[in-house]
Amino acid sequence: MHRKKVDNRIRILIENGVAERQRSLFVVVGDRGKDQVVILHHMLSKATVKARPSVLWCYKKELGFSSHRKKRMRQLQKKIKNGTLNIKQDDPFELFIAATNIRYCYYNETHKILGNTFGMCVLQDFEALTPNLLARTVETVEGGGLVVILLRTMNSLKQLYTVTMDVHSRYRTEAHQDVVGRFNERFILSLASCKKCLVIDDQLNILPISSHVATMEALPPQTPDESLGPSDLELRELKESLQDTQPVGVLVDCCKTLDQAKAVLKFIEGISEKTLRSTVALTAARGRGKSAALGLAIAGAVAFGYSNIFVTSPSPDNLHTLFEFVFKGFDALQYQEHLDYEIIQSLNPEFNKAVIRVNVFREHRQTIQYIHPADAVKLGQAELVVIDEAAAIPLPLVKSLLGPYLVFMASTINGYEGTGRSLSLKLIQQLRQQSAQSQVSTTAENKTTTTARLASARTLYEVSLQESIRYAPGDAVEKWLNDLLCLDCLNITRIVSGCPLPEACELYYVNRDTLFCYHKASEVFLQRLMALYVASHYKNSPNDLQMLSDAPAHHLFCLLPPVPPTQNALPEVLAVIQVCLEGEISRQSILNSLSRGKKASGDLIPWTVSEQFQDPDFGGLSGGRVVRIAVHPDYQGMGYGSRALQLLQMYYEGRFPCLEEKVLETPQEIHTVSSEAVSLLEEVITPRKDLPPLLLKLNERPAERLDYLGVSYGLTPRLLKFWKRAGFVPVYLRQTPNDLTGEHSCIMLKTLTDEDEADQGGWLAAFWKDFRRRFLALLSYQFSTFSPSLALNIIQNRNMGKPAQPALSREELEALFLPYDLKRLEMYSRNMVDYHLIMDMIPAISRIYFLNQLGDLALSAAQSALLLGIGLQHKSVDQLEKEIELPSGQLMGLFNRIIRKVVKLFNEVQEKAIEEQMVAAKDVVMEPTMKTLSDDLDEAAKEFQEKHKKEVGKLKSMDLSEYIIRGDDEEWNEVLNKAGPNASIISLKSDKKRKLEAKQEPKQSKKLKNRETKNKKDMKLKRKK
């Protein structure tokens, strides 16, 4: 192995980073990149004036070498024994592994390294890297440290554009298979913009993409005082000014940055007030020292004599840093363990010996106690409640933790997880409003009414930390990462133009190839889009950015104001819609999955609805799921979201026909680069030139054929109202709430039909009926926490129309209620008995009413809410008094009126049934015939003649001889004269034998024969004897 001089710019970059306390990024291309990690680490060790920097080594599955030290020694001895040991080749890496503190970590376990700090981070297996992992691992590197990304050998960096990433398998669905790697292209292009980034090969040659470092110069050496920035000097002055103010001075001495010191001062200000009506909300990005500031504040609260302090967090394991700084604060305040306080650790192995309680007994008994976020009822005696990582706790639980005591809360925003948006969007916004209301000056008229409210009103203080603890401000790697993953787009631009009419705005299709091409103009537009996303949604993850860029089924639309023809700049974005095309799954795939109880990735609505209704045909329909609608914060609630949705629906219904003969076609795949085209050391990477326009009018692109539009969102009254107004119908409501927001996921659908088709389609009506039936049954279980108004809003849906239900019959009524039940109802309707006597019948009455089986029974909104609350949610009148906001006496009056109406309807059903049973005289209705009288007579004559002919024919064919009457006229005259005029029977002599005689003769002869045979048999027997 021959020696080679390493490019001096690599050493200068590392040394400058150490001097400025800023990180450096190296991308090493080549299979032997691991060997160059040793050289880079060696350079870093020489540049720093402290212990050997620790290393975080992240990988997917196979490390490529053994991390086990004993195993490595055995392998070394084996090589010595075989005589294959090459000291020059093997030694450097062996020595590096043996002498360096390396933390090996699988990518799927990187959440465990949060809060740790390393001097160097190595990321191998590029195909497993996701934006989340990149942000999570890079964030752990301290100032002056190195981030090293290892790539396999390739002849051109453009080959990375077509690398299949592991996450791409999740983006593919049965109908959409072709993934385009736009994110990788943008990642490679962004490396050129990072001043602290070097792309090198595995021989440490600098590649042309890093040409910006051609003129890199080493920084002149600085004294410790010269290296301090203005904020460091201000922090030093603050610490000196507070030396005489105790216990604040010693606590501020523990702070690392000016921001952190100011946050601790704000906390101590809240503690020293002792009004117990303040909320201090601390928000910051990762690595800004939030937990440390909270820990120091708790130590300050103990010093100020607070007795009951409660700390909550998603898990006690997350509070290591907080309690570490509580004890550092105690040390600064000269508290001694065992003498002044004792520490109690958890015995639960899951919590990793986390601190759960601290008992302080220096002056009087004081406790710092961990409680679970769900145990808000235990806060009765609390004086201070500290909520760490509040964004990771469900919003309803955080609200329940607020009470008549001092509250400190800290939350991460702008981090890779993007969790803090739920806190800042919803909770802090509500606290701001409450705080503003309490500050309103009370006039003479409202003084009495607001006294009680002001007594319970809370004051909100907001603190944010900008400066990082680990590295110096202005870190180039942080800026590169924020730009690449659109993390730092919280500061949304205010729109200076007026509000255009929603009807005048137009929807445009955004071409993703152009959006992610890393051109300056498209980058500005992308940052604007992501700023809207962050400002209008509670959870945004960098992984969403990769899905938006690479997933083949996702499409992006934006609503823009009318643009004057002379305008050259990009217009302001009013709203963004992200749509995911779903469905077109084969029936066989669905049947296989339903039978095994498994669902494929993607296609959220088809799989969920198919599973819920056990319908294998629904997945075959093609649909579009609205993933996000993000409206500019200045323009929310003005109708722009509804306008964007309306235009999107019209587009997919085919109302914007594409009239151009030559449709603008976007390439479905990026052209691969042949290996002979250009060498790695000569290649120049620039954004593509031959790109289509960024924005297309809807009539410039043909729409996909869709059967329905759908949406899945966290149910809130405001969102439900928005989607119902847009014509959507609920078909699914998840029974368990979301872990982060505490909201139930709701799926709503709308069929895309022509204008003349008013009905919503047979399958949607069937789904809606089934959903309503099941929802009514579940209202007393999982959905009993819903307010009656929200539940009523879900049940009542004008978009489906009121189905024609058959009126309630007497048989159905008798199946539900006995005659005695109806008697009880009637007694209550006359105010003769108490309402408790009929409570057992209210669930049945409620159910048949909300299933539209009570015909035209009309109830007001308040009556419907009351019936639903008592009958289906099984709530007490006291609970409903708060929720419906009416006094209980008024509620009982409404309830009595409901029962009166029901009794009246039941009586009508019974009366109608009795009326039908009674025989009513029917009037004969005479109607004139169409035929004339002569035609009618002719027809009757013909019928008679034909009938007569048939009868005559029958008589002719019959033998009637036995009916002939004998005797001539003389004999008849003689007999008649003898009988006289009054005789009723006469007899005439006939020559025919009588029937009886004729019948007896053969019988007698038969008897004689039988006797003769019997006599003969007897004679034979006698002879034999």
Curated annotation (Swiss-Prot):
Enzyme class: transferase
Keyword Mitochondrion included in the entry's annotation: no
Enzyme Commission number(s): 2.3.1.-
Residues covered by region (Required for localization to the nucleolus and midbody): 702-1025
Entry's induction text: Transcriptionally activated by genotoxic agents; possible role in DNA damage and induction of cellular resistance to genotoxic agents.
InterPro entries in UniProt: Acyl_CoA_acyltransferase (IPR016181), GNAT_dom (IPR000182), NAT10 (IPR033688), NAT10/TcmA_helicase (IPR007807), P-loop_NTPase (IPR027417), TmcA/NAT10/Kre33 (IPR032672), TmcA_N (IPR013562), tRNA_bind_dom (IPR027992)
Residues engaged in binding ATP: G287, R288, G289, K290, S291, A292, A293, L294, G295, L296, R470
Biological process terms in GO annotation: negative regulation of telomere maintenance via telomerase; positive regulation of translation; protein acetylation; regulation of centrosome duplication; regulation of translation; ribosomal small subunit biogenesis; rRNA acetylation involved in maturation of SSU-rRNA; rRNA modification
Domain N-acetyltransferase residue range list: 558-753
Catalytic activity field: a cytidine in 18S rRNA + acetyl-CoA + ATP + H2O = an N(4)-acetylcytidine in 18S rRNA + ADP + phosphate + CoA + H(+); a cytidine in tRNA + acetyl-CoA + ATP + H2O = an N(4)-acetylcytidine in tRNA + ADP + phosphate + CoA + H(+); a cytidine in mRNA + acetyl-CoA + ATP + H2O = an N(4)-acetylcytidine in mRNA + ADP + phosphate + CoA + H(+)
Localization terms from the record: Nucleus, Nucleolus; Midbody
Residues reported to bind acetyl-CoA: I629, A630, V631, Q636, G637, M638, G639, Y640, G641, S642, R725
Modified residues (Phosphoserine): S934, S984, S987
Assigned keywords, A-Z: Acetylation, Acyltransferase, ATP-binding, Nucleotide-binding, Nucleus, Phosphoprotein, rRNA processing, Transferase, tRNA processing
Residue(s) carrying N6-acetyllysine: K426
Post-translational modification Phosphothreonine, affected residues: T716
Highest taxon in the source lineage: Eukaryota
The UniProt record lists the keyword DNA repair: no
GO cellular component terms attached to this protein's record: chromosome, telomeric region; membrane; midbody; nucleolus; nucleoplasm; nucleus; small-subunit processome; telomerase holoenzyme complex
Region (Disordered): 990-1025
Function as written in the Swiss-Prot or TrEMBL entry: RNA cytidine acetyltransferase that catalyzes the formation of N(4)-acetylcytidine (ac4C) modification on mRNAs, 18S rRNA and tRNAs. Catalyzes ac4C modification of a broad range of mRNAs, enhancing mRNA stability and translation. mRNA ac4C modification is frequently present within wobble cytidine sites and promotes translation efficiency. Mediates the formation of ac4C at position 1842 in 18S rRNA. May also catalyze the formation of ac4C at position 1337 in 18S rRNA. Required for early nucleolar cleavages of precursor rRNA at sites A0, A1 and A2 during 18S rRNA synthesis.
Oligomeric form and interacting partners: Part of the small subunit (SSU) processome, composed of more than 70 proteins and the RNA chaperone small nucleolar RNA (snoRNA) U3. Interacts with THUMPD1. Interacts with SUN1 (via N-terminus). Interacts with TERT.
HAMAP family: RNA_acetyltr_Nat10 (MF_03211)
Similarity remark: Belongs to the RNA cytidine acetyltransferase family. NAT10 subfamily.
Protein name: RNA cytidine acetyltransferase
Lineage, opening ranks: Eukaryota, Metazoa, Chordata, Craniata, Vertebrata
